[in-house]
Amino acid sequence: MITEALIVSAILFAIGVVGVLTRRNAIILFMCAELMLNAVNLSFVAFSRLHGVTGHVFVIMVMTVAAAEAALGLAIVIAIYRHFGTVDLSNLRTLRG
């Protein structure tokens, strides 16, 4: 059972990495980062089946950090959209004061 969970976790993490490396939309970038965090959560839960509840504690901590990261990231994306009119990161290469 743990092998299947780790395989699924690795596939989800790889999909997230490919999404982060290939996409330029900020919202898609955050979704891929959340997918990678959920893949790590899945592996923590799979390992906690063998070693007690330590993995579940880490999952709760990672979910808390992910929620804060998502809220802050979306606030930044909204501010970028209001200022530049787009969320495409390739258009934001020039930083002006």
From Swiss-Prot:
Domain of life: Bacteria
Annotated Pfam families: Oxidored_q2
Keywords annotated in UniProt: Cell inner membrane, Cell membrane, Membrane, NAD, Quinone, Translocase, Transmembrane, Transmembrane helix, Transport, Ubiquinone
Topology with respect to the bilayer: Multi-pass membrane protein
EC number: 7.1.1.-
GO biological process: one example: ATP synthesis coupled electron transport
Annotated signal peptide: none
TM regions (residue ranges): 1-21, 27-47, 58-78
GO cellular component: NADH dehydrogenase complex; plasma membrane
Location(s), subcellular: Cell inner membrane
GO molecular function, one term: NADH:ubiquinone reductase (non-electrogenic) activity
The reaction(s) this protein catalyses: a quinone + NADH + 5 H(+)(in) = a quinol + NAD(+) + 4 H(+)(out)
Role according to the record: NDH-1 shuttles electrons from NADH, via FMN and iron-sulfur (Fe-S) centers, to quinones in the respiratory chain. The immediate electron acceptor for the enzyme in this species is believed to be ubiquinone. Couples the redox reaction to proton translocation (for every two electrons transferred, four hydrogen ions are translocated across the cytoplasmic membrane), and thus conserves the redox energy in a proton gradient.
NCBIfam families the record matches: PRK05715.1-2, PRK05715.1-3
Assembly mode: NDH-1 is composed of 14 different subunits. Subunits NuoA, H, J, K, L, M, N constitute the membrane sector of the complex.
Similarity comment: family membership: Belongs to the complex I subunit 4L family.
PANTHER family from the UniProt entry: NADH-UBIQUINONE OXIDOREDUCTASE CHAIN 4L (PTHR11434:SF16), NADH-UBIQUINONE OXIDOREDUCTASE SUBUNIT ND4L (PTHR11434)
Protein name stated in the entry: NADH-quinone oxidoreductase subunit K
Gene symbol of the encoding locus: nuoK
